[in-house]
Amino acid sequence: LDPDTGRLKWHYQVTPGDNWDYTATQHIILADLVIGSKPRKVLMQAPKNGFFYVIDRVTGELLSADKYIPATWASHVDMKTGRPVETPEGDWSKETKIIVPAAFGGHNWHPMASNPQTGLVYIPAMQPAGIYPPSTEHLQTGKYTRREMFWNPGVDWNNYTNTVYAILAQTGGN
């Protein structure tokens, strides 16, 4: 928003359609980074969908969007359109799918941190899998009802991983 007029300057939606409950309410870190030898005022976020985003907070330009966990619902984010490229594994409209991350997300309410001296962002990440039974109800606005869904199906609890990842903010790589 423009602080003087209140008008919308730009917006970005990390999970268009959001058929997996990947809300993006996780906090946003503001930073000044040098990207491609150019100083940029950026915002960084690791929402539930498994991608770490770096966006120019002045222009709204998507600078990077890389996986921080092995998400299966999308292969990558198309940097020209800014949209995630959904995979067949992520489409649960016709058959039950096991999808990573589950609705709990790859990163939830746990705070992430950044270190301006090293350029690293630290993300407390999870890798839960979720069972999504077939439904097309989620595709119809206002038609969703609660249903039984499961997370971490068939995964040995000893192998359920929570990890703190250190990601280089300038590149999005971990």
Summary of predicted features, one role per range:
Residues 1-24, 31-39, 51-98, 129-174:
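Extracytoplasmic/lumenal domain signature
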Residues 13, 44, 101:
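Glycine- and other small-residue-rich loops at beta-strand/loop junctions that grip anionic moieties
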Residues 22-47, 108-113, 118-125:
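Repeat-blade elements of multi-bladed beta-propeller folds
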Residues 85, 94-98, 104-130:
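Long, low-complexity segments enriched in small/aliphatic residues
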